[in-house]
Amino acid sequence: FKKFNLGKAIQAGKDAAQAISLSDADIAAMSKEYMEWMDKHNPLTKPDSEYGKRLERLTGNIKEVDGMKVNFGVYEVVDVNAFACGDGSVRICAGLMDVMTDEEVMAVIGHEIGHVIHTDSKDAMKNAYFRSAVKNAAGAASSQVAKLTDSELGAMAEALAGAQYSQKQEYEADAYGVEFCVKNNIDPYGMYKSLNKLLELSNGAPASSYMQRMFSSHPDTAKRVARAKELADKYKQ
């Protein structure tokens, strides 16, 4: 993908979405590079580990979601976290699997995939690329396709870790999580239960944590949890 002219972008005062003209192919290439970097810098559990076996039991039959090929993995880290990327990669941290039931884990997976399907992750990737370029003073004008450097990928990982979605985006991802559970014969209340659990864990959690990012707008938190329950109720009627 092409490097953007950072000087002009800053001078124009444009936000990330406006400053960067990235095609779907660019995003796909960045996503692939990003996931290669993440998998290199985080310990992936082995398929025959307890986490690996559990993940296979939950997701082994899921090869594609809404036309997107998916692959799953577990990072053997204590963080209560999960994310999905534009290349179809879904990663769950062992810390999240430790505190959640199977249906709650599946709901979170569905929620994160929902952000990709709804292109929320694409926008977050654009913003992260802009922020990483600023941090690394990258962005010299170039018409040549270039790979991200290791430092740029590290900065992008840092930027994505702090990314927050709008309440509307979170509502839609929650709804997708409920539907994902239903399609895979999982309790539709998994989303409601996982949100409740994350809400409990968010008390006192660092502002940069997954729990705090999931509930970035505190006044609407109760509504969001209630809405997830209402969505599940419809499938139980």
Cite the ranges covered by each PLM segment.
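A Zn2+-metalloprotease active-site environment signal
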Residues: 1-237
